[in-house]
A protein has these predicted regions:
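Short, small-residue-biased leader/transition segments that mark boundaries at the very start
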Residues: 1-2
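Conserved AMP-binding/adenylate-forming
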Residues: 5-66, 73-76
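AMP-binding/adenylate-forming catalytic core of the ANL superfamily
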Residues: 11, 51, 56-144
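General small-molecule cofactor/ligand-binding pocket signal
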Residues: 34, 104, 149-152
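Short, ordered coil/turn segments that flank beta-strands lining enzyme active or ligand-binding pockets
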Residues: 37, 63, 110, 153, ...
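Generic structural signal for well-ordered beta-strand positions
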Residues: 42, 68-70, 158, 164
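Conserved C-terminal "lid"/linker of ANL adenylate-forming enzymes
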Residues: 77, 116-120, 135-174
């Protein structure tokens, strides 16, 4: 289910398992959706909210009127004019790493921002610096590759267990 906190209700469904599992959400009949010029999701759900909702969710629409979430507008790294969606980098790397990690950014004089990888410092892990660099070079577009890898004791998480992006950004600046 796709739920917007602002609506306090669900506005769409998707199958998460089985042969028909999909990353595409199907809005309820009473809900209409569209994209802003920045590709953020705009929701009109008059049965649950009096006003049109403008989200920070970067989305994609398909011909069947379904949508999928690609990431958050506030999780975009602008490196040398190239916009990099943090969640897409993480999703690409997830299947290759054995150690918890997250992507963030740091300021850079030349590029504006650079991609930074924070990884838990687990002694004995197969994820050595050299292996991390090799994986990134093999599976990511060059401009998505982390320019810096920072080992941390624990990844910063919110109280709900989600990545704490603000704290991660601060760690990347050290």
């Amino acid at each position: 289910m796709y739920k917007r906190q602002e609506t306090l209700s669900h506005i769409a469904l998707r199958r998460v398992n089985g042969t028909e599992a999909s990353e595409w959400y199907t809005p309820f009949e009473s809900v209409s959706i569209r994209l802003s010029q920045e590709n953020t999701l705009i929701i009109n759900a008059p049965k649950v909210c009096d006003k049109v909702l403008y989200t920070n969710d970067i989305a994609e629409l398909n011909a069947q009127g379904q949508f999928r979430i690609l990431g958050r507008k506030d999780n975009i790294i602008n490196s040398g004019g190239v916009k990099i969606q943090i969640e897409q980098v993480e999703a690409t790397l997830k299947k290759h790493f054995h150690t918890p990690f997250m992507i963030t950014s740091a300021p850079d004089a030349k590029f504006g921002e650079i991609v930074v990888l924070l990884i838990e410092n687990n002694p004995g892990s197969r994820d050595t610096y050299e292996r991390i660099q090799k994986i990134c070079e093999d599976v990511l577009p060059a401009y998505w590759c982390p320019k810096r890898v920072i080992p941390v004791e624990n990844l910063p998480l919110t109280e709900t267990g989600k990545p704490d992006r603000a704290t991660a950004k601060l760690l990347a600046q050290t």
